[in-house]
């Protein structure tokens, strides 16, 4: 590859591979490429939360998620949700299940930001359907034991909408 190729030239090549005309520099294809480039490749480990940041988020219990909108640039409306920590990872669930608008956006866009404990962090979102869900149920049960909403968040509808939130490298 010629090292003198500009970023624009590379974008044109990628757009051509995706089936877009080189003069079709619409915001969405470029944004999707930029977003994909910011994601770790499949099988590559995501950066972990710093222990102090994760504990501040869990303790504050004021997490708001803002997955990107369909344009891949605009953050969605911050939505307050419960969160738990299991094995150093931050998990959330959509109480109303996979039809929840924030959940749908998080799974579709795979990125956005969170606001919690006085911090704003760009993050990735990934659905979690593995065996860790039993431990996530236990973490929710322990943290929110006095809430009348506990049974809903550990029920099958919410469990099917479990998301792991990972910080993007800073």
Language-model-derived ranges and their functions:
Residues 27-76:
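Short, conserved active-site entrance elements at the starts or edges of catalytic domains
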Residues 58-60, 78, 87, 109, ...:
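Extracytoplasmic
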Residues 10-21:
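Bacterial N-terminal signal peptides
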Residues 20-28:
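Bacterial Sec-dependent signal peptides at the C-terminal "C-region" and cleavage site
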Residues 29-47, 97-170:
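Short, structured beta-strand-loop surface elements
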Residues 2-12:
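Bacterial N-terminal signal peptides that target proteins for export
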Residues 61-96, 124:
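Short beta-strand segments
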Residues 54-55, 82, 153-155:
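Short secondary-structure boundary/capping segments
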């Amino acid at each position: 590859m010629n090292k003198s190729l500009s970023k624009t030239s590379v974008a044109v090549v990628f757009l051509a591979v995706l089936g877009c005309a080189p003069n079709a520099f619409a915001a969405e294809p470029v944004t999707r490429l930029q977003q994909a480039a910011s994601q770790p490749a499949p099988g590559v480990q995501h950066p972990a939360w710093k222990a102090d940041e994760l504990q501040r988020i869990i303790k504050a219990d004021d997490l708001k998620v803002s997955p990107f909108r369909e344009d891949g640039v605009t953050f969605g409306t911050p939505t307050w949700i419960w969160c738990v920590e299991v094995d150093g990872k931050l998990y959330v669930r959509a109480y109303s299940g996979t039809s929840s608008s924030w959940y749908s956006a998080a799974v579709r866009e795979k990125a956005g930001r969170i606001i919690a404990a006085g911090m704003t962090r760009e993050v990735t979102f990934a659905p979690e359907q593995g065996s860790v869900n039993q431990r996530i149920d236990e973490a929710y049960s322990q943290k929110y034991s006095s809430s009348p909403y506990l049974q809903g968040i550990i029920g099958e509808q919410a469990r099917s909408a479990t998301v792991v939130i990972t910080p993007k490298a800073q």
